[in-house]
Design a protein with these regions (language model features):
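Short helix-capping and hinge/turn segments at secondary-structure transitions, especially at repeat
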Residues: 219-227, 263-266, 276, 280-284
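Oxyanion-binding "anion nests"
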Residues: 210-259
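A short beta-turn/strand-edge loop motif at beta-sheet boundaries
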Residues: 211, 266-267
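Short, well-ordered beta-strand elements within core beta-sheets of diverse protein domains
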Residues: 87, 256-263
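N-terminal Rossmann-like NAD(P) cofactor-binding subdomain of oxidoreductases
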Residues: 1-206, 239-240, 268, 273, ...
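Conserved small/polar residues in nucleotide/adenosyl-binding loops
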Residues: 291-292
Length: 292
């Protein structure tokens, strides 16, 4: 890519926004040019707006410290200088849906970390190794929004991203029953040990809302685009997922243990072979973050 894409971060002062900032530092493809947050933060430098709330394990990158934060509610102005937006905004779901659609209607693509649009039928919820063909639904979404370039795409819940690629690799063996336990870091709750000291040496065996997401979202990921309806139809085959989601005293990184029953017999050697040799359309793109 000869010229970097200019990107903005909506919700830049929060923990997910901070993670975007660290991930995009010195990125060969993207240049962060706009940091948007609440009206309370607008007009301040990023360092002033965040203050002592920087939660990353590495220092705040120099490139953002003196950038002036803009009001994320002013979608037209914020979007005018970017090629697309990363959304990490933290607000009620209906407000997230509304503001992300406002940005899309400025003809700005929105890539969202939020859950608000995950079940909007014409919004793709993508795990690149599994379902990049779901991007085809964007054509229908644009018709609904009245846009030619703007759209919304989302990522799924963080708890399913570790194990769903394995299910895709073993698709030929027809996974029928999945029993998964996830052990989720406190960063998933937007916390560090500094502001959640009760988690040191502690385990919480239930995370509100996570089990429903872990059981239902894979069905949309494994679904298909219905061109006639202009939406993604969740997988309705013989697949049952049961989950338990546990908060553990780890700062970053989730772990999942998965027990599977298949419709077709498979040997250990066959399962290993399919994992090792699994490829997808995403593999052809040579993405910087692709697993090697």
């Amino acid at each position: 890519m000869s010229e970097k894409l200019k990107v903005g971060i909506l919700g830049a002062t929060g923990m997910v926004g901070q993670r975007f900032i660290t991930l995009l530092e010195n990125h060969p493809w993207f240049e962060v040019v706009t940091l948007a947050a609440s009206a309370h933060s607008a007009g301040k430098t990023y360092a002033e707006a965040v203050g002592d709330r920087w939660k990353m394990e590495t220092p705040m990158p120099e490139y953002v410290k003196n950038m002036v934060v803009v009001d994320g509610d002013d979608a037209e102005s914020v979007a005018s200088g970017v090629d697309f937006m990363f959304s990490a905004v933290n607000m009620p779901k209906d407000q997230i849906r509304a503001i992300e659609e406002r940005y899309a209607k400025t003809e700005t693509p929105v890539v969202s970390n939020n859950s608000a649009h995950r079940w909007t039928p014409d919004v793709p919820m993508v795990v690149p190794e599994i379902n990049p063909e779901h991007f085809e639904v964007i054509e229908h979404q644009r018709k609904r929004l009245g846009t030619t370039r703007g759209f919304i795409a989302v990522k799924p819940n963080c708890s399913i991203q570790a194990y769903t690629p394995a299910l895709a690799a073993w698709k030929e063996f027809e996974p029928r029953e999945v029993v998964v336990s996830t052990y989720q870091a406190i960063s998933g709750a937007g916390k560090t040990f500094k502001d959640w000291p009760e988690m040191v040496g502690n385990i919480i065996p239930f995370i509100s809302g996570e089990e429903a997401k872990s059981e239902k979202e894979p069905l949309k990921v494994f679904g298909h685009v219905d061109a006639a309806k202009g939406e993604i139809v969740p997988f309705d085959g013989d697949l049952k997922i049961t989950s338990q989601c546990i908060r553990v005293p780890v700062l970053n990184g989730h772990t999942a243990t998965v027990f599977l029953n298949f419709g077709k017999k498979a040997t250990k050697e066959e399962l290993i072979d399919r994992l090792v040799n699994y490829t997808s359309k995403a593999s052809e793109l040579e993405l910087r973050s692709e697993e090697r």
